[in-house]
Amino acid sequence: MKLSRLALLSVFALASAPSWAESVVTVYSIDGLHDGDNSWYQVQFDAFTKATGITVRYVEGGGGVVVERLAKERTNPQADVLVTAPPFIQRAAAEKLLANFNTDAASAIPDANNLYSPLVKNYLSFIYNSKLLKTAPASWQDLLDAKFKNKLQYSTPGQAADGMAVMLQAFHSFGSKDAGFAYLGKLQANNVGPSASTGKLTALVNKGEIYVANGDLQMNLAQMERNPNVKIFWPANDKGERSALAIPYVIGLVQGAPQSENGKKLINFLLSKEAQTRVSELSWGMPVRSDVTPSDEHYKAATAALEGVQSWQPNWDDVAVSLSADISRWHKVTESE
């Protein structure tokens, strides 16, 4: 998931848009669920249009970028549905960009509330070149080894959601912000440099240009089919514990949405059992509904990858409040201002 790109994708031809004015729903979404020719989004949008006659207009951008666009359009909203990741969904809620809406699936989705709901589970992950490294780096301390100098890269906090996740994971693994920042300052000696895109790092690892990079589980599992030298790992802390920050895709209804009822219909459709059952099959994500357990091979691979890894999440409201200050401090400790 990245924060730098904003692109308008028309899911269906809109030549007759004026006559369809009330049969359209506009989605502003973070990337990741519309990748490939037969993505989860594409399949669900097609099925939604077939069932309702409502065309989906799709705008893709970074988690922060789509929220910023909503804020700029506050007096004249253009979107009906927002999909982003924490802490950007919390920022949207705090800025009153989201409308009250309890989804039909709320009782089956942990952490759903009246402003937003998790849509697809996802987790921070790390990748390494298994052709050049016999084993994955076992611990965070291993990544400080001189053999990784200019062979390690992680995406930049503030530019990439997964880069922000690395920063938060360091706070968690080392027990405090101070200790996490101290570690990231040391790690900078091996870091190739800034990267606005997390997804592009996978090809560099596969080629052996770098040995280690960050990512997210859904994206990395999908990319491994095209990048055979890449494997996933999670470094352990000094107690030998491996953990992964949960960074789900989250969905909400836009405040003042021009087609609010259509937005509600689409949200309920994407959170339905039928749609959730196919998210792993089509996009390597994991369903958020407690009453859905897919049986496809992608789901089995994702759950197997997480064996022995403890998932966790911070208080995202607190993260949203301190994020700007934390990113500024990251730039200082890494001397990357």
UniProtKB/Swiss-Prot annotation:
List localization entries.
Periplasm
Major place of localization?
periplasm
This protein's UniProt keywords: Periplasm, Signal, Transport
The cross-references to CDD domains, in alphabetical order and at most eight, read: PBP2_AEPn_like
Q: Which residues form the signal peptide?
A: 1-21
Q: Does the keyword Plastid apply?
A: no
Q: Which GO terms describe its cellular component?
A: outer membrane-bounded periplasmic space
Q: Which GO terms describe its molecular function?
A: thiamine binding; thiamine pyrophosphate binding
InterPro entries reported in the protein's UniProt record: AminoethylPonate_ABC-bd, SBP
Q: Name one GO biological process term.
A: thiamine transport
SUPFAM superfamilies with a match to the protein in the record:
Periplasmic binding protein-like II (SSF53850)
Q: Which Pfam families match?
A: SBP_bac_1
Q: List the disulfide bonds in this chain.
A: none
Q: What protein family does this chain belong to? A: Belongs to the bacterial solute-binding protein 1 family.
Q: What does this protein do?
A: Probably part of the PhnSTUV complex (TC 3.A.1.11.5) involved in 2-aminoethylphosphonate import.
- What this protein is called in its record is Putative 2-aminoethylphosphonate-binding periplasmic protein
Q: Which species expresses this protein natively?
A: Salmonella choleraesuis (strain SC-B67)
